[in-house]
């Protein structure tokens, strides 16, 4: 099974188009994040985030086999715990995305929403590391997320391997490993969506694999919907090339492509039936223009990232 655990909604996508893109990329399950970066939505406007959550709820309704909807909340909002509960219990979303902009994960006033997430038993995805749109990344250093350990049982994923603080991110994830906590019970896992620019990618992923292992790493394209399946597939090709360079074995690849995210989402790991694609995920072909042998090839980065 292949899970894309990091897909941004814009508010302009339709369910059929999303599923077609996933089919074309041979992705079995997509984690759809409520829009917060596109026109009409803002992390600083709780009312717009409620509309965003309603939008993604409509997209995923009736397609829980293929789509997992994540709410977006601003934990500084005193009503955020209530909005989160409504998104999960009423709208049917299954997780939440948060972006530390103007708040630190250890701030006292954001702890109630983390406590509510723990009560709801949902996975959380956080932006970690630098931004590429000019915002300050000072709120998003991986060690700041250690405060979440005050809420044992949370299931947390830090995006982008915390780049440029990859070593910090690995250290945060390593604590449970040192203490002998089984992978499925570890608080932190990390998505390998492309925060690191090309010169850093192999080193960042290689270190994470060597220290944390594949059970704590999961694929996320960080694509912005609506997009073509070819765009998602291209980013998958980048990961395939890295895994080939690092000589990662088949079992570890299965965990990175889907097993780790399936456990994080509370799924059984069985691949649902796709609509149009009949090819096996293990038979993935890189896009023709994916220069697997050119590690210096620049990524086509957007001017927004989280």
Which residue stretches match the model-derived regions?
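Mid-to-C-terminal alpha-helical segments outside catalytic/metal-binding sites
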Residues: 1-5, 16-29, 85-86, 212-218, ...
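Mid-domain alpha/beta scaffold segments of enzyme catalytic cores
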Residues: 1-112, 116-120, 191, 237, ...
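Short active-site segment of divalent metal-dependent hydrolases/proteases
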Residues: 9-10, 130, 163, 225
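Short aromatic-enriched loop/helix-cap "lid" or pocket-rim segments at secondary-structure transitions
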Residues: 15-16, 43-45, 82-84, 110, ...
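Flexible loop residues that form catalytic
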Residues: 35, 75, 101, 129, ...
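Ligand-binding grooves and catalytic loops that recognize ribose/phosphate and carbohydrate rings
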Residues: 37-62, 131-147, 230-247, 256-261
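A structural motif corresponding to the C-terminal end of an alpha-helix
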Residues: 59-67, 150-154, 211, 245-252
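Catalytic pocket-lining loop regions of alpha/beta-barrel enzymes
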Residues: 94-95, 103-218, 301, 305
């Amino acid at each position: 099974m292949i899970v894309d655990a990091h897909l941004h909604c814009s508010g302009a996508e339709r369910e059929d188009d999303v599923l077609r893109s996933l089919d074309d990329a041979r992705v079995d399950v997509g984690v759809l994040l409520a829009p917060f970066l596109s026109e009409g939505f803002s992390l600083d406007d709780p009312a717009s985030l409620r509309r965003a959550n309603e939008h993604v709820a409509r997209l995923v309704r009736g397609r829980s086999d293929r789509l997992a909807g994540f709410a977006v909340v601003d934990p500084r909002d005193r009503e955020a715990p209530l909005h989160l509960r409504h998104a999960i219990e009423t709208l049917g979303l299954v997780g939440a995305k948060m972006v530390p902009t103007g708040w630190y994960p250890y701030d006292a006033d954001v702890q109630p929403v983390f406590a509510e997430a723990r009560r709801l038993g949902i996975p959380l995805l956080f932006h970690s590391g630098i931004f590429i749109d000019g915002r300050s990344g000072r709120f998003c250093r991986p060690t700041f997320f250690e405060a979440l350990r005050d809420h044992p049982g949370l299931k947390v994923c830090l995006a982008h391997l915390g780049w440029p603080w990859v070593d910090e991110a690995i250290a945060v994830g390593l604590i449970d490993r040192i203490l002998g906590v089984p992978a499925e019970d570890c608080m932190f896992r990390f998505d390998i969506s492309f925060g690191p620019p090309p010169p850093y990618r192999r080193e960042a992923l290689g270190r994470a694999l060597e220290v944390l292992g594949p059970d704590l790493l999961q694929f996320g394209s960080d694509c912005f919907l609506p997009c073509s399946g070819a765009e998602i597939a291209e980013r998958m090709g980048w990961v395939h090339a890295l895994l080939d360079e690092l000589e990662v074995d088949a079992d570890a690849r299965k965990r990175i492509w889907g097993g780790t995210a399936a456990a994080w989402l509370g799924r059984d790991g069985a691949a649902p039936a796709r609509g149009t694609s009949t090819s096996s995920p293990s038979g993935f072909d890189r896009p023709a223009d994916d220069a697997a042998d050119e590690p210096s090839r620049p990524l086509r980065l957007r001017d927004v990232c989280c």
